[in-house]
Each structure stands twice: as structure tokens, then as C-alpha cells.
């Protein structure tokens, strides 16, 4: 029973078909990998080619900032969200009401009022014990477009382990955040649950953010069975 519910790593057939369609539709929008032409070292070139074959091209004109702790990324995340002019995409496994997420949500609500398009996606099981029932409806009431990924169904199902463990923020297509930290207070050590929590992360600026944008849209569109 436990294996059927949580051990099966394969997505439901319907969801897998939706993901496959979205991936094929997205492939033409992946930037051509011009970096390959610039690399002389055969070992490095081979690694870049391998990544490129899996639709993870290496980009020029990009910067990265490393965070050794979630609390280091937190303030930069708030600062960059507040600067958004066009759109914000956020996709997280766990969100929980508290200092971290409440600060994020306040900015998102303000950005909606300013005309910025805000899309938010959280995993229904990852946040199951953290949020009120149908929390996505609350976010939608603020004008935030929201998806609760793969709704939990309270009976034995072979597809309940199809979860979205990503932690991604994309701002205006040129600022991105990713890493191991979710949007909950334990990830910035405001709440001590299992001792001092350490998850790393990065802020990306420039062309490399394009792939994060595409990754978000693939999951978003597959969940809605739409194309954008």
C-alpha cells in the first residue's frame, strides 16, 4: 500500500502525456547553444554537448550569486520581487504562512496592484499540512494566478508520488532564483524544527534565466493542459 501511494515515481499517464506535449512544444524556444562554438577544450566541450542534448544549454551573458543559507537568499529575493515590472513566476514544493512567505505574499499582492502578472504554483502534498484547505483560492482572491500541483486525493493512488519538488522564482525573464530552500520559516532559521537548517541556492541574472522560464511554463501548461 505504501509503495503504491508513495513509492511509484512515474507520473500518471494523462499527466505524462501533457508533459511530453509541452516539452516538444517548448524545444524550439530553447536558445541555440553558441557556447559550443567557442570552447576548444574537448572535455569541457563534451560536457556542454551532453547538457545541450538534454535541452539544458550553457549560456553566455549571465551572472550567478551563490547563497550558503536560505536566510542569505531571502532578503535578495524580496528586493528583486519588489523591482518586478512585467511578470513573476514562482514554483515551490513547500510554502507555509509565516515571516518568510508572508513577506513574499505582501510584495506579490502589491505587484498585482501595479499591473504585474503573478503566477504561483505549489505542490499540494508538499504543502498539505502547512496550509489551509484550498489555499490557492485565497491567492487567487488577490489576483494571483495559482495552481496547486497534482491535487491530493485521500485514497490509495499510484500517482500521488508525482510531486513537484522544484524551487524556482523568475522575475521579468532576467532574474531567477533556485536552490534547496522552500518558502517556509524553517528555511531561514526563523523556526527551529530539526536544528539549524542549511540549504543552498543561487540567484541568476541574464540569458540563463530563460531555461527557468521555460521549465516553469512547461509545468504550468501541462497542469492546465494549455499552451502559452
Regions found by a protein language model. Name each.
Residues 1-228:
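N-terminal localization/anchoring segments of enzymes in phospholipid and broader phosphate metabolism
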Amino acid at each position: 500500500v505504501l509503495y503504491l501511494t508513495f513509492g511509484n515515481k512515474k507520473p500518471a499517464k494523462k499527466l505524462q502525456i501533457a508533459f511530453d506535449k509541452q516539452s516538444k512544444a517548448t524545444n524550439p524556444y530553447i536558445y541555440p547553444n553558441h557556447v559550443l562554438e567557442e570552447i576548444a577544450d574537448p572535455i569541457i566541450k563534451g560536457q556542454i554537448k551532453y547538457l545541450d542534448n538534454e535541452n539544458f544549454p550553457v549560456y553566455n551573458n549571465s551572472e550567478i550569486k551563490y547563497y550558503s543559507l536560505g536566510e542569505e537568499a531571502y532578503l535578495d529575493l524580496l528586493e528583486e520581487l519588489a523591482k518586478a515590472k512585467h511578470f513573476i513566476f514562482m514554483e515551490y514544493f513547500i510554502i507555509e504562512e509565516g515571516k518568510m512567505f508572508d513577506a513574499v505574499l505582501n510584495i506579490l499582492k502589491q505587484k498585482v496592484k501595479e499591473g504585474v502578472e503573478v503566477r504561483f504554483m505549489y505542490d499540494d502534498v508538499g504543502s498539505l499540512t502547512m496550509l489551509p484547505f484550498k489555499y490557492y483560492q485565497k491567492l487567487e482572491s488577490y489576483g494571483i494566478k495559482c495552481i496547486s500541483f497534482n491535487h491530493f486525493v485521500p485514497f490509495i493512488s499510484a500517482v500521488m508520488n508525482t510531486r513537484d519538488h522544484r524551487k524556482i522564482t523568475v522575475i521579468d525573464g532576467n532574474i531567477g532564483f533556485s536552490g534547496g530552500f522552500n518558502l517556509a520559516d524553517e528555511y531561514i532559521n526563523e523556526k527551529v524544527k530539526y536544528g539549524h537548517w542549511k540549504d543552498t541556492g543561487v540567484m541568476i541574472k541574464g540569458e540563463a534565466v530563460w531555461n527557468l522560464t521555460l521549465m516553469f511554463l512547461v509545468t504550468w501548461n501541462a497542469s492546465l493542459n494549455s499552451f502559452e
